[in-house]
């Protein structure tokens, strides 16, 4: 199976978002607004947690994929790119987790 990365998924979401009248699921989510996208992300997060608690590997993988998709759609709805998230993660690697958390609390 060919490798499919989170960047590939983000590019697919970008293409479907730009597709105008296309009836894709992605386009329908975005057309309903960021609030709806956030609710869908929350639903998928709960389903992912349940799968993890139930120790169901197959279900966790499926729900994790759904969660990643809905996270990227939510980011798109709010004008945030995955590269923005990567930048924030990269900044955090320059300090320990405890230092990073303390810095956030000062802001």
Curated annotation (Swiss-Prot):
Pfam families: PRA-PH. Pathway: Amino-acid biosynthesis; L-histidine biosynthesis; L-histidine from 5-phospho-alpha-D-ribose 1-diphosphate: step 2/9. Its EC number is 3.6.1.31. It is found in: Cytoplasm. One of its GO terms (biological process) is L-histidine biosynthetic process. GO terms for cellular component: cytoplasm. One of its GO terms (molecular function) is phosphoribosyl-ATP diphosphatase activity. Keywords: Amino-acid biosynthesis, ATP-binding, Cytoplasm, Histidine biosynthesis, Hydrolase, Nucleotide-binding. InterPro entries: HisE (IPR008179), PRib-ATP_PPHydrolase-like (IPR021130). It catalyses: 1-(5-phospho-beta-D-ribosyl)-ATP + H2O = 1-(5-phospho-beta-D-ribosyl)-5'-AMP + diphosphate + H(+). Belongs to the PRA-PH family. This is Phosphoribosyl-ATP pyrophosphatase. It comes from Nitrobacter hamburgensis (strain DSM 10229 / NCIMB 13809 / X14).
């Amino acid at each position: 199976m060919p490798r499919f990365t989170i960047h590939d998924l983000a590019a697919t979401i970008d293409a479907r978002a730009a597709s105008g009248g296309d009836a894709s699921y992605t386009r329908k989510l975005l057309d309903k607004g960021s609030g709806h996208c956030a609710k869908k992300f929350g639903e998928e997060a709960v389903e992912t947690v349940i799968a993890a608690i139930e120790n169901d590997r197959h279900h966790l993988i499926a729900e994790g994929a759904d969660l990643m998709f809905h996270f990227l759609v939510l980011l798109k709805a709010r004008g945030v790119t995955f590269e923005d998230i990567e930048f924030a993660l990269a900044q955090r690697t320059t300090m320990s987790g405890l230092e990073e958390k303390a810095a956030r609390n000062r802001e």
